[in-house]
């Protein structure tokens, strides 16, 4: 007598969770396999294929309370004159301060200007 897949499925659907767990253990032993969740392996492969961003833009989102300190920080960080720094800071927000920086330089610039009270974002 041959049992088809539908009959097996019907028999399994009538079992309790404990019985199904025991059946899985028996199948693992019989066939020398493991029921490790393969989804975790696939997720890791997808994560590896996603490239990390290599170029960043530094945006000034908010000046904060100490405008003069922000002007000085921007002037120093971007090697601008006083008037250019002031005009840049007083233009409409958000302001792109620098584009195409690597992650290390972008983080450094962000930290330098944020110490003056400004709010910076990396894109």
Swiss-Prot record:
A GO molecular-function descriptor: structural constituent of ribosome
Leader sequence residues: none
Stored CDD domains: Ribosomal_L7_L12
Family: Belongs to the bacterial ribosomal protein bL12 family.
Lineage of producing organism: Bacteria, Pseudomonadati, Pseudomonadota, Gammaproteobacteria, Enterobacterales
The keyword Ribonucleoprotein is assigned to this record: yes
InterPro entries assigned to the protein according to its UniProt record, in alphabetical order: Ribosomal_bL12 (IPR000206), Ribosomal_bL12_C (IPR013823), Ribosomal_bL12_C/ClpS-like (IPR014719), Ribosomal_bL12_oligo (IPR008932), Ribosomal_bL12_oligo_N_sf (IPR036235)
The protein's name: Large ribosomal subunit protein bL12
Entry keyword Ribonucleoprotein: yes
Role description: Forms part of the ribosomal stalk which helps the ribosome interact with GTP-bound translation factors. Is thus essential for accurate translation.
HAMAP family listed in its UniProt record: Ribosomal_bL12
Pfam families: Ribosomal_L12, Ribosomal_L12_N
BP GO annotations: translation
Assembly: Homodimer. Part of the ribosomal stalk of the 50S ribosomal subunit. Forms a multimeric L10(L12)X complex, where L10 forms an elongated spine to which 2 to 4 L12 dimers bind in a sequential fashion. Binds GTP-bound translation factors.
Keywords linked to the UniProt accession: Ribonucleoprotein, Ribosomal protein
Organism: Wigglesworthia glossinidia brevipalpis
GO cellular component terms, semicolon-separated: cytosolic large ribosomal subunit
């Amino acid at each position: 007598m041959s049992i088809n897949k539908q009959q097996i499925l019907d028999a399994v659907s009538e079992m309790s969770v404990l019985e199904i767990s025991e059946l899985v253990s028996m199948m693992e032993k019989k066939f020398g396999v493991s029921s490790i969740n393969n989804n975790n392996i696939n997720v890791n492969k997808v994560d590896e294929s996603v490239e990390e961003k290599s170029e960043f833009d530094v945006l000034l989102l908010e000046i904060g309370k100490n405008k003069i300190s922000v002007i000085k920080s921007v002037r120093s960080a971007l090697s601008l004159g006083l008037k250019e720094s002031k005009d840049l800071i007083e233009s409409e927000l958000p302001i792109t301060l620098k584009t195409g920086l690597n992650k290390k330089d972008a983080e450094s610039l962000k930290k330098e200007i944020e110490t003056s009270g400004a709010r910076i974002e990396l894109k």
